[in-house]
Regions:
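Helix-turn-helix
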Residues: 10, 18-60
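Amphipathic alpha-helical packing segments from all-alpha helical-bundle domains
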Residues: 105-118, 122-152
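Hydrophobic/aromatic residues within well-ordered alpha-helical segments
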Residues: 50, 57, 61, 65, ...
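N-terminal intrinsically disordered/low-complexity leader segments
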Residues: 1-6, 76-77
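Alpha-helix N-cap and coil->helix boundary residues
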Residues: 27-28, 109-113, 159-163, 188
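Hydrophobic/aromatic-rich alpha-helical bundle segments in the mid-to-C-terminal region
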Residues: 129, 133, 137, 147-198
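Short amphipathic alpha-helical interface segments enriched in basic and hydrophobic/aromatic residues
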Residues: 16, 20, 24, 62, ...
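Hydrophobic alpha-helical connector segments
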Residues: 56, 69-108, 164-165
Length: 207
């Protein structure tokens, strides 16, 4: 990476850190330049304005999400995707969910991006759409697909797949948001999620 490219990335990293705490309106170009250790005028050689920095951050966040999220990659009509889920057990479901949750909570970029989206979703329509897609639409689509798949395989009882998926994943989303606000409660939340998933499989296990 060139020196200019390195500085540009440093600006984006500093911007993500500041925006995830202060939000867009409260973060100034002067603060960003100071965080990187460059003059304000120098920052403009990398980005035209603050909005350009935000746009670049949104693009980087979207690319990372598409690359790493299990929800973005789901294709329940693809045998290669479903192969390792054919004999899904409660233990497997627990590990699947907890693995994704740990990644979301502990990857610095993803964690900060989530907080930035939470702050900015009420000001920026594009961020609101991204927040809905990442935290609701894709999650519900993934778990609805999983439930339908397990019903077809005779592992779960016949019921409304979308409602079953909501019962499974939406409480987890609430607990995940709790961890964002109170990270010291992660161990408690992890135990709750495990109990929740196991009870779901007990309730809906095919007779």
């Amino acid at each position: 990476m060139t020196a200019k490219g390195s500085t540009k990335q440093e600006i984006l990293d500093a911007a993500l850190e500041l925006l995830s705490v202060q939000g867009y309106e409260a973060t100034s170009i002067s603060q960003l330049a100071e965080a990187v250790g460059i003059r304000k005028a120098s920052l403009y050689s990398h980005f035209e304005n603050k909005q350009a920095i935000l746009d670049a951050l949104m693009q980087a966040t979207l690319e990372q999400y598409e690359q790493h999220s299990i929800f973005a990659k789901a294709d329940w009509d693809d045998p290669a995707f479903t192969k390792d889920k054919e004999n899904m057990t409660p233990d497997m479901a627990v590990q699947l969910c907890l693995g994704q949750i740990r990644y979301i909570l502990h990857d610095p970029q993803i964690s900060r991006a989530r907080k930035m989206l939470t702050i900015e979703q009420f000001r920026n329509r594009q961020m609101a759409s991204m927040q809905t897609k990442r935290n609701y639409t894709d999650v519900m689509s993934y778990f609805t697909g999983l439930v339908r798949f397990l019903i077809r395989r005779g592992q779960l009882a016949e019921a409304d797949p979308e409602i079953m998926a909501a019962q499974l994943c939406l409480p987890v989303s609430v607990w995940l948001n709790l961890c964002d606000r109170e990270p010291e409660r992660e161990a408690e939340v992890t135990r709750l999620i495990e109990r929740h998933i196991r009870q779901f499989f007990d309730v809906y296990r095919a007779k």
